[in-house]
Amino acid sequence: MPCTNQALPNGEGIDLVFLRDWKNLGDLLYLQSIRSGRIDENSSIAVSYRAMLSVNAQRLADFVVHTGVEFDVVAMAPSSRDDAVPYHECIMNRLCATDISERFSKSKSTQSGSSGSSQQDVVDAITYMAEGDEGVFRNLLIVDDSFASGKTIAAMLYHLRKAGLNNCSITVAVPALLRQ
């Protein structure tokens, strides 16, 4: 199971579970290429990605379960696209955890993986509706479609910490790790 520790832009450390890294993306290159506008939905890589989507979602869910962590809360990163949804749904089908994804929203289009967006831009683009239970979260899993800069995850954690999150282990699950 590919798993690594990563530092976020704010210096916070997370555990990252992923299917493939930059050197071995294969059809998961679709996730990077579609955001940058460099690929057509009818291209062979897009067709291959969609053909393998359910298999890849199941594999990522297997990796998450095999971490041995009993996640009590799960959040899907807010996005203008729905690429993380199949992975999130497959993982939620395997876990007994509270889903707080609907508490997050993205108010404006910000490409968090791009060098043109600052960490503050990403924090400002994401909103969070606190419910007062954040202080009791112990093992948080964040699901996204890819991990590049870590700005989205750092922004989500900023809002959760502001709402009372503390003493909580953070794991991020993505199909594609877009940096080495």
Outline where the language-model segments fall.
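Gly/Ser/Thr-rich loops at beta-strand to alpha-helix junctions
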Residues: 78-85, 149-151
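Acidic/polar low-complexity segments with low predicted structural confidence
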Residues: 57, 76, 91-94
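PRPP/pyrophosphate-binding module of the type I phosphoribosyltransferase fold
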Residues: 113-180
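Structural alpha-beta junctions
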Residues: 70, 95-101, 161-171
